[in-house]
Amino acid sequence: KKIPFQEIDKTDHQISFYASTKKSTESLAHSYSSLWKLPITMLRFFTVYGPYGRPDMAYFKFTKNILKGKKIDIFNRGKMYRDYTYIDDITDGIYKLLNKAPSLNSKKKFKNDSLSSVAPFRILNIGNTKKIYLLDFINTLEKELGKKIKKNYMPMQKGDVHSTLSDSSLLKRITGYNPKTNYKIGIKKFIKWYLNYYH
């Protein structure tokens, strides 16, 4: 499997409903863009974490269970990595894109540009561009919470992927995007928010 992921990589054979819905959304958006000449930029987010995040995300559930003294399920024995991207870096990237809408007359200026040839449409990765192993992420949670984690090692989940890593160089070339938050700092900020918000 090719890592890091680029916007122009083929994504035609999804192995989960989650991935299928994301691909379907991109296809529908491209159709709208083509039919009505509507400028659209689709963003592929890479494992966003931080305050006010989705409670169903692993880092959120881990934190909740650790504080309750419950075991946390660690799939594939933790032998996987993700491109954890802090919310502040995500919002910074989105803000930089606001005046960079694709146009029908645009020409591909960059190598591996995902700009459509028939619509004002482009797909962009937005990630931290660094691989963080799951166990390193969990160990940092443990340190910041000051609690020993009870771990329940599980096999790989059906439909899950071993690793994700973004190539966000196209976004950087278009906007100057440059994620700055180290995952340890991001976790520290998240834990501070979580304890204040929920306790």
Predicted regions and their residues:
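Active-site helix-initiating loop/hinge in glycosyltransferases
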Residues: G50, R54, D83-Y86
